[in-house]
Amino acid sequence: TQGGKPFDPARGKQYEAGVKYVPKDLPVVVTAAVYQLTKNNNLTADPANPTSGFSVQGGEIRSRGFELEAKAAVSANVNVTAAYSYTDAEYTHDTWYEGRRPAEVPRNMASLWADYTFHETALSGLTVGAGARYIGNTVTYYSSASPKAYESFNVAGYALADATVKYDLARFGLPGSSVGVNVNNIF
């Protein structure tokens, strides 16, 4: 604070409901969830000194959305996971941002992942996998000399590719243990 006093902790409240579907005849799991999160005691720009960099407490952010995920064992060796999430986030109480989407919170995110595990071969226990993630567009705010004090610009969505190689150590007497290398953001 401007007076040097520490802020109170931020508080959150979450409501969530979900379902899980596992068909009897297929090696598939499908989940869906809806949620609402509310964060109180968020820091917001000091209305008395908006461009000073000082904050006051009292802002509130609400996020509502849903998530979908499907996992399938395509074969004894191949697993595929696909996921999608939608988030509608908004400052519901804030000095400058009320009614706006919080910075760096995408509305849409999606991912697709596949892995192949070797069984009963010389490579038994080895898993290789690859996937892609999509992060939708976001908004970012910056300070300006305008009467609004904070302006915004959109940041375009982007996709990332990831990969993994891991080895199950069960054959060495360490069931449940593995070693692996993950490479994120390959391109």
Model-derived features with residue positions:
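Outer-membrane beta-barrel translocator domains and adjoining extracellular loop/strand segments
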Residues: 1-5, 42-51, 87-99, 139-148
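Residue-level marker for the onset of beta-strands and adjacent loop->beta junctions
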Residues: 3, 54-57, 66, 161, ...
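Secondary-structure boundary/capping signal
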Residues: 25-27, 78, 122, 173
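Extracytoplasmic low-complexity repetitive segments enriched in small/polar residues
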Residues: 1, 28, 38, 42, ...
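Gram-negative outer-membrane beta-barrel transporters
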Residues: 36, 56-143
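Outer-membrane beta-barrel domain signature
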Residues: 4-8, 55-57, 97-103, 151-154
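Membrane-embedded beta-barrel scaffold of Gram-negative outer-membrane proteins
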Residues: 9-66, 73, 85, 89-91
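Conserved C-terminal beta-signal and adjacent last beta-strands/turns
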Residues: 15, 103-187
